[in-house]
């Protein structure tokens, strides 16, 4: 231990304080040699032939510390990932096996479509014609089976003209007579005459005045 002396400026007293040698910043030769021996004794031994870590494979790694040596295990692959990889490999192999049979199946499918294409068109046309006839044709325009012929440009024109005439005939078939029209308007006409007589005390049917608040005078032209 060294001593550090401090002298006061005012009173002139001297204070003595003991401080460790490490704080003084002075290193002797004996302390330097002792520190070197301590450092060399703490260095880990180098790997030799007898070291178990020298012959280990790539899967085992070691972490060296001052006091002991720890082994780092290799990363473990989860089983779910291994199953997924195996499933993809099997699916790819199965797809490669099924590839040669695909062109033959496609040719058979095209042949079946070509054979049944005409029948499907005829069935669809028949259903569409039946549906349109059932939904849009009035009862008065339904023709008998004897009048139906093969469709064509001339037949289409004649059909449109005949259907138009038939519609005009059905609309203008009933014309009321004059007597029926008079009976239809008679009730409304009587109501108007009654309202006129009560308001103006004059009869428009007989063309003569009636007793009331108005006084009527005949004009001689």
Curated annotation (Swiss-Prot):
Residues 63-87 have a biased composition (Basic and acidic residues). One of its GO terms (molecular function) is cyclin-dependent protein serine/threonine kinase inhibitor activity. It comes from the Eukaryota. GO terms for biological process: regulation of cell cycle. Induction: By auxin. Down-regulated by cytokinin. GO terms for cellular component: nucleus. Residues 31-42 have a biased composition (Polar residues). The keyword Ribonucleoprotein does not apply. Belongs to the CDI family. ICK/KRP subfamily. This is Cyclin-dependent kinase inhibitor 5. It comes from Oryza sativa subsp. japonica (Rice).
């Amino acid at each position: 231990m060294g001593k550090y002396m401090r002298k006061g400026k005012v009173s002139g007293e001297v204070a003595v304080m003991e401080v460790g040698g490490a704080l003084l910043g002075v290193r002797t030769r004996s302390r330097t040699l002792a520190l070197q021996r301590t450092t060399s004794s703490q260095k880990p031994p180098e790997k030799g032939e007898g070291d178990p870590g020298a012959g280990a494979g790539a899967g085992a790694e070691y972490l060296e510390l001052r006091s002991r040596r720890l082994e780092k295990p290799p990363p473990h692959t989860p089983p779910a990932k291994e199953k997924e990889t195996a499933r993809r490999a099997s699916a790819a192999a199965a797809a490669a096996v099924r590839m040669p049979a695909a062109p033959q199946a496609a040719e058979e499918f095209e042949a079946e479509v070509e054979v049944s294409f005409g029948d499907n068109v005829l069935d669809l046309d028949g259903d569409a014609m039946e549906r349109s006839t059932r939904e849009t044709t009035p009862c008065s325009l339904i023709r008998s089976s004897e009048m139906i012929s093969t469709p064509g440009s001339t037949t289409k024109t004649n059909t449109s003209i005949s259907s138009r005439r038939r519609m005009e005939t059905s609309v203008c078939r009933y014309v009321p007579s004059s007597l029926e029209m008079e009976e239809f308007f008679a009730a409304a006409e009587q109501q108007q005459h009654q309202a006129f007589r009560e308001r103006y005390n004059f009869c428009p049917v007989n063309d003569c005045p009636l007793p009331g608040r108005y006084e009527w005078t005949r004009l001689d032209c």
